[in-house]
Design a protein with these regions (language model features):
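Nucleotide phosphate-binding/pyrophosphate-handling subdomain across enzymes
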Residues: 1-70
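C-terminal helical cap/extension that packs against the catalytic core
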Residues: 17-18, 61-124
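Short glycine-/acidic-enriched loop or helix-start segments at secondary-structure transitions
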Residues: 30, 57-59, 83, 136-139
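Active-site catalytic pocket residues across diverse enzymes, especially alpha/beta-hydrolases
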Residues: 36, 40, 92, 96, ...
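Cofactor-binding loop segments of dinucleotide-utilizing enzymes, especially the Rossmann-like FAD-
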Residues: 49-53, 75-76, 129
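Glycine/aspartate-rich loop-and-adjacent alpha/beta segment that forms the canonical ThDP
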Residues: 130-144
């Protein structure tokens, strides 16, 4: 068991400087934030976030927003449970200041936006919020 690794949990791709973590609930987000804080990053990361509407995403946002510079919202690939990228962006823009928010039409657009932003800052890209979000981005970019 000591060597078991759960796919989608704290998977860092060094060559692309992308961290995949399927923090899909409050406990998961708390763990992700603790890890990001432990890394003592010089530049706050860019977050690609897609969440399910039946999760406590309000508390998840309260925890993650202070440690990131930008959030790119994406709709998870689960039509019945997904919180849309537009709804998530509206929640962020209404309730949080000092955070850049962009809406991606799909996983491919989300990673493209994040890579474009990173060209100027070299910030870590963090993909999180649900296994659906991670799966779509990993498949799209052959990072599985």
């Amino acid at each position: 068991l000591a060597n078991v690794k759960l796919v989608g949990r704290m998977n860092y791709h060094k060559t692309s400087n992308i961290l995949f973590d399927a923090a899909h609930n409050v406990d998961g987000i708390n763990g992700l934030v603790a890890a990001l804080n432990a890394w003592h990053l010089k530049i706050k990361p860019t977050l690609i976030l897609g969440v399910l509407k039946d999760k406590d995403y309000h508390e998840m946002l309260d925890t993650i927003v202070p440690v990131v510079q930008r959030i790119i919202t994406v709709t998870p690939n689960n039509k019945t449970r997904a919180l849309s990228a537009d709804e998530l962006a509206a929640e962020l823009l209404t309730n949080y200041q000092n955070i850049d928010v962009e809406i991606a039409s799909d996983a491919s657009a989300a990673i493209s936006l994040a890579m474009r932003v990173r060209e100027s800052s070299q910030a870590l890209i963090v993909v999180t919020g649900s296994f659906y979000t991670l799966s779509a981005i990993q498949k799209d970019h052959r990072m599985a």
